Amino acid sequence: MGCFGRTPKSNKRSDTKTTKNNDFTPKKLTVNANRDKLTQPSSDCLKVSICGDVSKEIVTKKDQLALDAKDTNVEDEVIVKKAQTFTFEELSVSTGNFKSDCFLGEGGFGKVYKGFIEKINQVVAIKQLDRNGAQGIREFVVEVLTLSLADHPNLVKLIGFCAEGVQRLLVYEYMPLGSLDNHLHDLPSGKNPLAWNTRMKIAAGAARGLEYLHDTMKPPVIYRDLKCSNILIDEGYHAKLSDFGLAKVGPRGSETHVSTRVMGTYGYCAPDYALTGQLTFKSDVYSFGVVLLELITGRKAYDNTRTRNHQSLVEWANPLFKDRKNFKKMVDPLLEGDYPVRGLYQALAIAAMCVQEQPSMRPVIADVVMALDHLASSKYDRSHRQKQDNVTETKVDEEKTLTTESNVCVEEKQEIKICSDQAT
């Protein structure tokens, strides 16, 4: 495709060829309207892995509800150092007892509210985890650990948490522009669509956050739940990854993958991971490719309101990737032609490589970042496009004029020849 430069550092992850497992077939991947996760962990027990092999514990669902902050047992008290602890009363007061006016949204693991905490003088987003789900407890532990160890401008900042009795709450920095999903899909009347430049900026920011998880975090982390609703937008359309409850420590040393239960969101899950349960860094790259396609096309990763062959974004796009003549048909119609054709071709080439069926054919995220940084820095100006169009139209007019003049000259020559013959 020619859009990927080579990174100076050797950071390519090795991937194994995946084979079908009889225990995991596509039939198990069903869409649940009430919850967008593909599968749920067993309600009998749950393995909570902290910082890879630092600490592992098996807890029953009943025991999980009794966990307190001290029970997370984090090495070197990293949580205490980097994340504040809040009482449930403090967070309740900050949201007006979680009143509806403060409600921001709801995800697979709980509800999110906007609040103001006086003791830190800051507006925050507070996620109250679902107390009835074993998944929510695991998410709480993993997310606190991941964000306590992470430090990157393209990852949402964890301010603190509350683990009091049966209550589990996470406190984040507040993102005033909501999620990417709010800006791409089902736009309310009068809301302007994202400009091309903004879309590429968001894509590059999300890719940088993913690159940090894969290549800088120690140990490296596989995000496992990259989707538009988990990309939050700060002022200036600065993208930040959020919701790390499904994150897993990636393969290390000679390992090529992590074997795990398949979890994620339908439409974003890599086919190799869905079939085998073998999770790799390339699984995240596939999910990123789906997000990039959403940014380019304006379509949802999975839309059951469309005809059967067009419900899956990747299945719809794959046949169109084969011929560049189709590329303009793929762009979001809300852009109304306001995009650079060359930039569109390059962005679609990147997306096409990311959603390759075989993980070995997908690029590493560092190469994706390099390509998208170039696209994001190439500012598109509509007036420049109009000038280009005017130049093209002028050339066409000139060619038509030259053709017409040439025809006139031929006709004049023929008339002269006829007159000459008659005179003779």
Curated annotation (Swiss-Prot):
The lineage of its organism: Eukaryota, Viridiplantae, Streptophyta, Embryophyta, Tracheophyta. A lipid is attached at G2 (N-myristoyl glycine). May be involved in plant defense signaling. PANTHER family: OS07G0668900 PROTEIN, SERINE_THREONINE-PROTEIN KINASE PBL5-RELATED. The active site is at D225 (proton acceptor). The modification Phosphoserine is found at S229, S259. The modification Phosphotyrosine is found at Y172, Y273. It comes from Arabidopsis thaliana (Mouse-ear cress). This is Probable serine/threonine-protein kinase PBL6. InterPro entries: Kinase-like_dom_sf, Prot_kinase_dom, Protein_kinase_ATP_BS, Ser/Thr_kinase_AS.
